[in-house]
Amino acid sequence: MWTTWHDNVGKPMKADYVKMVGIANQGAKELGYADVGAMWRSGYDMTPEQFSAETERLWGEVKPLYLALHTYVRRKLNEKYGDTVQPNTGAIRADLLGNMWAQEWGTIYPLVAPKGAGDLGYDIGDLLKAQGRTPIDMVKAGEGFYSSLGFAPLPETFWKRSMIVKPADREVICHASAWDVDNKDDIRIKMCTKVDSNDFVTIHHELGHNYYQRAYNQQPFLYLNGANDGFHEAIGDFIALSITPQYLVQIGLLDKAKVPSADKDIGLLLRQAMDKVAFLPFGLLIDRYRWGIFDGSIQPADYNKAWTKMRLDYQGVTPPAPRSDDGFDAGAKFHVPGNTPYTRYFLARILQFQFYQAACKQAGWKGPLHRCSFYGDKKVGANLNKMLEMGMSKPWPEALKAFTGTPQMSAKPMLDY
């Protein structure tokens, strides 16, 4: 499947992608930028060169943890498949990690779960179904989290105009998204909600966009956005980190007697790391690869060779079969042909833990960070709103300082977690 997908999706678009690069670069130059990559890197209140160095610095902070996770997962895969499929040294085969792009590894958690700690003790989807909760109930629960922090309820139009379940009468794009239609209060989400754990978390994430959009809607038009694009993705993610057993007890989903004991923590943290930590090098390399294409240091003849090398250097993954030099494996990832900047997702992974740790400190949380929930803490909500309502009106370090007390991005909170 891996080979078929990359051969049939990536390779046929290569010629068109080369044309698109030329057209996009021409437009960037007309706007005063050296190329599209420089234009993308200019949106962070620092020079493109400084931003490139900043992201590399952050990667340096988390790389040792990633390498430890990579080594552990590789050993487990070697135990499962043997040396001929997955050796116990070197790179991991990209098709063994449970995701077409090897960007998140959570789906193979059962394969690598530590003995005795693998069962997390509950499944949110099962808890929802046991109580007969509907997709609307799930969105109401998400709204309830933000309301508990002191944010105003969602407007009536949200419930009338959002697409919360897949319509029966037409085809739709089910990829979850959040919308601000009028820069005032016409906020909506669009998703094909299923009653399961993933969509419960996704709802908390998407509503984060909506509450951010609403918070800065008094700003002048040019400031109607997040402090940087990583902030917008991080807001909902950090709220979702607070979907802890304690929170599930607070909203009546989980029986207090069934809260997992501390001996389940290793499993819980590994499951989080399989998505949160495993994603980091991928989140970085998608744009680093394209910056090279846009500035000409990666030529069309070398597209595939450069992609394979960068995946090896950053992720430590390798294709399951030899790849042709005239292919375009990177094109098999939606954001590449879609020309969507991707570093925002790397930044969001870092920032969400900074926001989460700051909120937990403000709430006076004393236990392990990963068990914290600040549900119901109006002080946290007021401090959060101060950052959100700034929109883009201040440089992002000022917005970051307003909530966390520091103007610098740091991966330390993720490591603490």
Predicted regions and their residues:
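Short alpha-helical functional segments enriched in proximate histidine and acidic residues
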Residues: G27, L65, F145-S148, N210, ...
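Catalytic Zn2+-binding segment of zinc metalloproteases
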Residues: L207-L222, I239, I243
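Post-HExxH zinc-binding segment in Zn-dependent metallohydrolases
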Residues: T55-L65, G226-K264
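C-terminal, non-catalytic "cap/extension" segments appended to globular domains
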Residues: D35-A38, P48, Q103-L120, G132, ...
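Short amphipathic alpha-helical coiled-coil/interface segments
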Residues: W2-M13, Y17-A24, Y44, F51, ...
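Active-site-proximal, well-structured secondary-structure segments within enzyme catalytic domains
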Residues: K19-K190, V259-Q272, A278
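Short alpha-helix carrying the canonical HExxH Zn2+-binding catalytic motif
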Residues: M20, D196-Y211
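Generic beta-strand/beta-sheet core signal
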Residues: R161, K190-C192, N210-Q213, L224
